Amino acid sequence: MDYTTVLAQAMQTLEQRKDRSAWGRGVTAYAVDMLQQIADYYKDGYISADDLATWTTAEAAALNGARDWSEYSWGGSALVYDGDIAAALCTPSELKKTRNGDRRPNSREEWLDVQARALRQAFRRVYSAIRAARQEVQQ
């Protein structure tokens, strides 16, 4: 199966999402970037259709060598600066409360941990969009 149309349809699904919260919009933005990266890897021959067949292999392809989403985030594979992460995931009032990311988001996490949570959710959205598009194309 050629995944070019599947990935294009999954991208369309993600781009058409109407998220209401700042967190949801941020997670969707991460998902769109992640799917674009996966599509580029597929187009350039770095990953095959088999790599996108199951959750585990697709996640390994998306992680690009990292062990998990925390390592992906802390390793610099996504946004690096606290202010950029805060701007991507927070409402204006949360940005003000954290002084545009200068303060920690909460007592238990750093901004890179928050980003790792968002990336994990983004991959869930990516994989469910790929799975739905694959079923649609097969019919």
What are the roles of these predicted feature ranges?
Residues G45-Y81:
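Short, charged early-sequence alpha-helical segments and their helix-coil boundaries
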Residues S73-Q138:
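Amphipathic alpha-helical binding modules
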